[in-house]
């Protein structure tokens, strides 16, 4: 699919989502991966918009959490924000919107189209594009429809100190320690992004991404706890018990 066709698809997408744009250039940039920008003249990647969008979502989510959740501490508010303004959470929203289908990316990088971090970046970039093109009022309409309902369903108890919660659960079945395998991602993604794999006895229970090792580890622990709540929980219990017998 060529750029012209993608832009036509973008215009239709914006119309369907009640975003009456003033300047399409913001949205084109928001959906342009740097591998595509590197191969084409006079087009910029979404990197700077992703930076702006991240800052906007941090602020907007903080205000919403303060208004929506009663009697919470600063630490609890930070946990709720970290749970929702993270790669996995924003990636889910991006995929629901279908942003990756509109992504301009080099042919050699097509395998990255469904990448979690890239989809999260797309959501942040798209938020920045709406803000820069149409202002705060229109962005609020968009966030009320797409983003705030996602935050409002957060169960605070389920996200309190996910690393300790997972460790306590594992220790109830096994004496083996858990570890976090940290990888710094570079090249096609971006430097200063960390991937954390939560591992126990050679098995990966959760994977997280973050701009710091701490954030990546917390997200990995959160994903691991979600795995334990899934239908496969009994299978995991049996596997851990089997380890104890060995």
UniProtKB/Swiss-Prot annotation:
Alphabetic keyword roster: Cytoplasm, Endonuclease, Hydrolase, Magnesium, Metal-binding, mRNA processing, Nuclease, RNA-binding, rRNA processing, rRNA-binding, tRNA processing
Chief location bin: cytoplasm
EC number: 3.1.26.3
Cysteines joined through disulfide linkages: none
GO molecular function, one term: double-stranded RNA binding
Catalytic activity entry: Endonucleolytic cleavage to 5'-phosphomonoester
Annotated ranges, domain RNase III: 10-135
The protein's assembly and partners: Homodimer.
Function: Digests double-stranded RNA. Involved in the processing of primary rRNA transcript to yield the immediate precursors to the large and small rRNAs (23S and 16S). Processes some mRNAs, and tRNAs when they are encoded in the rRNA operon. Processes pre-crRNA and tracrRNA of type II CRISPR loci if present in the organism.
Record-linked NCBIfam families: RNaseIII
PANTHER family assigned to the protein according to its UniProt record, in alphabetical order: RIBONUCLEASE 3, RIBONUCLEASE III
Protein name (Swiss-Prot/TrEMBL): Ribonuclease 3
The organism of origin for this protein: Mycoplasma mobile (strain ATCC 43663 / 163K / NCTC 11711) (Mesomycoplasma mobile)
Name of the encoding gene: rnc
